[in-house]
């Protein structure tokens, strides 16, 4: 088993190995399948953004389409929740906001070379 490591510096948290390669591949496959069915959006159309600023393509996973994504992303969401709860407990975010946090929507974003600095963004 690969060791999970955490580094928080100036409120930027790096959680290595919390999301496995297998979980990443499931998210990518889900995105690609949803893109084939035209269930993704781009920010040029959605936000009326200039092609020079935003060109990425996104899939939004939420309660309205949980039947599409939950089984594929369940283990990733558990690990994301572990990392997120560690972060809010160790940065003062829980006290700063004063209300419980809830996941409402997961965005899987594909950004190609020259479109930004991420290849994949969750």
Language-model regions: role of each:
Residues 2-100:
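Non-heme Fe(II)/2-oxoglutarate
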Residues 97-112:
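Acidic, glycine-rich loop-and-strand cores that form catalytic or ligand-binding grooves
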Residues 108-122:
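Conserved short histidine dyad/triad with adjacent acidic residue
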């Amino acid at each position: 088993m690969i060791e999970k490591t955490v580094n928080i510096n100036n409120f930027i948290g790096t959680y290595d190995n919390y999301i496995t390669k297998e979980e990443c591949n499931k998210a990518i496959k889900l995105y690609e399948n949803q893109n084939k069915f035209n269930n993704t959006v781009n920010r040029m159309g959605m936000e009326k953004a200039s092609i020079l600023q935003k060109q990425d393509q996104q899939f939004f996973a939420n309660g309205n389409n949980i039947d599409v994504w939950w089984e594929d992303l369940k283990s990733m969401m558990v690990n994301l929740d572990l990392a997120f709860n560690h972060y809010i407990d160790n940065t003062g975010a829980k006290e700063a906001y004063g209300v419980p946090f809830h996941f409402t929507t997961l965005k899987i974003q594909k950004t190609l070379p020259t479109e930004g600095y991420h290849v994949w963004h969750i």
